[in-house]
């Protein structure tokens, strides 16, 4: 797979922005300092489809000859790891309803089963259940299917709806990923 370079464009579509913001009021991951005592700040990890920064603690930053980004996390009996705070993809333009209406034939995944990413090649394959979409309408439930693609292709074919809700530490609006393979009954 390709090597990701900071500042390179073409990782996502130009309208994709991904943020890590430890300062969201009442956010589940909000905090003033990371696990190493470094003051935290809002970071646009991806803006306009371009990779801007990594998430790093002191150790990972040193290995890459970068500065820490204030993303150290602590757990009992282990050295500091790396984690996000309130991590989210910003809203897109289309409403959820308009996104569904735009799909001639598709699959709305509401449950993913197992782990299926090859981190060397970027190949992605996962069991799923959800709803079939035909001519812009959700028609019926589907289970025991597999969805597959490649992460590079998925990122480039990803569009976000405008229905972002903050419920967890990691949040995203509904996303449409075009040109994935769907297999099953």
What are these regions (language model features)?
Residues 2-185:
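Dual-mode signal for accessory low-complexity, basic/Gly-rich regions
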